[in-house]
Amino acid sequence: MEDLKDKTAMQKTQIFNVIILDRSGSMQRIRQAAVDGFNETLIGIKKAQEKFADTQEHFVSLVTFCSCETCNVFDKVPVGKARPLSMNDYEPCCSTPLYDAMGFTLTAMHKQIKDIEDVAVVVTIITDGYENASKEYNGSSIKALVETLHKEGWTFTYMGANQDAMEVAMSMSIRNARNFDYSSEGTRASMRKDTTTRMNFFSRLSQMKNEAAFCAEPMSKEERLGCYGRLADEAFDEEENK
C-alpha cells in the first residue's frame, strides 16, 4: 500500500491557474462583481486542491492590466497561500493593452515552467472591451504564441463583454470563448461558469491520473499534455451545452 501511495504522490500534476483580468477604466461599472467573481474562482480552486490532493498541486497567478501598468497580484502562488482579492487591489483606470498583458504574462510563465515534467496550465482572459493600447505585442504575435502553447497542452478561455467574444478569441486561436453581459450579475455568472468548467476539468484529470497509475506503459510527456488539452476542451463543451 505504501508503494502505491508513493507512486501516486510522484505523479502529481502541477496545475497553474492563470487569470488575466482587464483593469481598464470601463471595468469600474463591474468592479465589485469582478472582485467577487475572482474570489469565487479562488474558493473553487482551493476546494479542488483539497478534493484532488493525491493527484494535483494547484498554483494561482492573477494578472490585472491597464495602460498604466500590468500588475502580478499573485505569481504562481500555492493556492493555500493565495488571499482573497480586495477592492484596493483592483482599481480600474486607463485603456486596454490586452495583447501586452497576455504576451508578457504567458511568455514569462512559459519560461518558468517549461521544464516541469507533469504540468497543466489553465488560462482565463476576462475583458469588457477590445485591445486598444498595446505597444510590444500585436494580434499576430499573440496568435502565434497561443498556438505554440496550445501544442504544449495549455488551455485558454476568453470571456468578453461589449464585443463578439467568439470572433475575438478566434483571431487569437483561442477555441473556448464566452460572451458575458456587461452587468454585475452577468460578470458573476460568467465567472461562475469558468469555475465550474475548471472543476470539471480537474475531476476528469484526477480520474485519468488514477487510471494511468495502473497502466503498464506510462504516457510520454507529449501524449499526456495532448490528453490534458482534450480533457479541458471537453469540460468547456459540457458546461456550454448544459
Model-flagged regions — what are they?
Residues 1-242:
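Acidic, low-complexity intrinsically disordered regions
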